[in-house]
Amino acid sequence: MRINPTTSGPGVSTLEEKNLGRIAQIIGPVLDVAFPPGKMPNIYNALIVKGRDTVDQQINVTCEVQQLLGNNRVRAVAMSATDGLTRGMEVIDTGAPLSVPVGGATLGRIFNVLGEPIDNLGPADTRTTSPIHRSAPAFIQLDTKLSIFETGIKVVDLLAPYRRGGKIGLFGGAGVGKTVLIMELINNIAKAHGGVSVFGGVGERTREGNDLYMEMKESGVINEENIAESKVALVYGQMNEPPGARMRVGLTALTMAEYFRDVNEQDVLLFIDNIFRFVQAGSEVSALLGRMPSAVGYQPTLSTEMGSLQERITSTKEGSITSIQAVYVPADDLTDPAPATTFAHLDATTVLSRGLAAKGIYPAVDPLDSTSTMLQPRIVGEEHYETAQRVKQTSQRYKELQDIIAILGLDELSEEDRLTVARARKIERFLSQPFFVAEVFTGSPGKYVGLAETIRGFQLILSGELDGLPEQAFYLVGNIDEATAKAMNLDVESKLKK
């Protein structure tokens, strides 16, 4: 972190001290720049191209040095479109990595990868900036306390509980509800959370970024009257951005979160949607940088790039960063190198299933594929652990019996298996829940269910006390009392029809 004496931003202060080079080659978002002998910039230094294009429009493109090629040339990746750049244009070496504004000045604002505000609310205070590249905290600084982070979402709190100060991944293919789930977590956690939140939109839809901003203004998380009282900073590098911006926007968001953790000593929530796009952007520029592709066409540096980002997302003795990351799973294949590399860094994985989404069960969280390091009796307690294990056993047995049911029918099962299937179907439906952020689509009000209520509900289903209720009574309700009330309503309706 550095304190800038003026508010001129993290750009160039005195050009006389800077190296000047010239563009030698442009291939899409990648530039080769020639510098005078002995004046080569360092890796990760920010370069600025200033000039005028062929129609006399002002150009101001920031690039980041990725490779030193020899013969006094460097290869850099542009953070914005390279349209209008020509060979021979002057390039300024800033002598430092990209730096972005940090601290209270970022709250309530939307920034791009360079730390420039993009919300039309005027310039941001850039007296305090921090470079986006830094090393992860040392082992001695890390905090190892274990505590549960309640989300109010039944399936998550029961089967794959989140760790306070941990890393959580939401895995799913296209259209199974990752973004809706991350929005619900922002709604349930960020609103009740005393600290600050940072949201990094990495290569996702611009419309969703806009919706989130409007929602946060409505809910008061962003305070329009007094912007400094806001609780969230937003950093966007969406689908329309070049790969350089998408590759670095996650680091910009993380740098802002680290300042709140290390300097302000706060507990921070970091939401990233979508971490796969960070890998994808790295893959797009990797071939242009002349690297040989690795498995499935990904960059050979995949693990290193992922590690350099993920290792910085951690909790120290000063404060914590609880990170919730959406992870797109290409073609629903969890063994794809991108999601597989991400798995290794997480404390809890919430896997979304297309099969459950097709049945209309939302959130479509797979109770058997989702895991958490927190689901241990010494952390969550015996009662929670036993209930979760019995729910998983019942769901697993139902899964095993599905082939038999499909071929021979339900009547061919033993009495015990039929009871297991009936309870498993109730559990499957009770794991669904109406969301606050989906109220506008579904028309049913959202529900927040406390952990104690969740455990009580599943214990009642497993004990057989609710065997007499129809399974549709458990679909899209909050706690178990709502399910019994819904069953009574269904009973009254069926009698009226007769």
Swiss-Prot record:
Keywords: ATP synthesis, ATP-binding, CF(1), Chloroplast, Hydrogen ion transport, Ion transport, Membrane, Nucleotide-binding, Plastid, Thylakoid, Translocase, Transport. It is a peripheral membrane protein. GO terms for cellular component: chloroplast thylakoid membrane; mitochondrion; proton-transporting ATP synthase complex. It comes from the Eukaryota. GO terms for biological process: proton motive force-driven mitochondrial ATP synthesis. Its EC number is 7.1.2.2. CDD domains: ATP-synt_F1_beta_C, ATP-synt_F1_beta_N, F1-ATPase_beta_CD. Its main location: plastid. It catalyses: ATP + H2O + 4 H(+)(in) = ADP + phosphate + 5 H(+)(out). One of its GO terms (molecular function) is proton-transporting ATP synthase activity, rotational mechanism. It is found in: Plastid, Chloroplast thylakoid membrane. ATP binds at residues 172-179. It holds the Pfam family ATP-synt_ab. SUPFAM superfamilies: C-terminal domain of alpha and beta subunits of F1 ATP synthase, N-terminal domain of alpha and beta subunits of F1 ATP synthase, P-loop containing nucleoside triphosphate hydrolases. Belongs to the ATPase alpha/beta chains family. F-type ATPases have 2 components, CF(1) - the catalytic core - and CF(0) - the membrane proton channel. CF(1) has five subunits: alpha(3), beta(3), gamma(1), delta(1), epsilon(1). CF(0) has four main subunits: a(1), b(1), b'(1) and c(9-12). NCBIfam families: atpD. Produces ATP from ADP in the presence of a proton gradient across the membrane. The catalytic sites are hosted primarily by the beta subunits. This is ATP synthase subunit beta, chloroplastic. It comes from Canella winterana (Wild cinnamon).
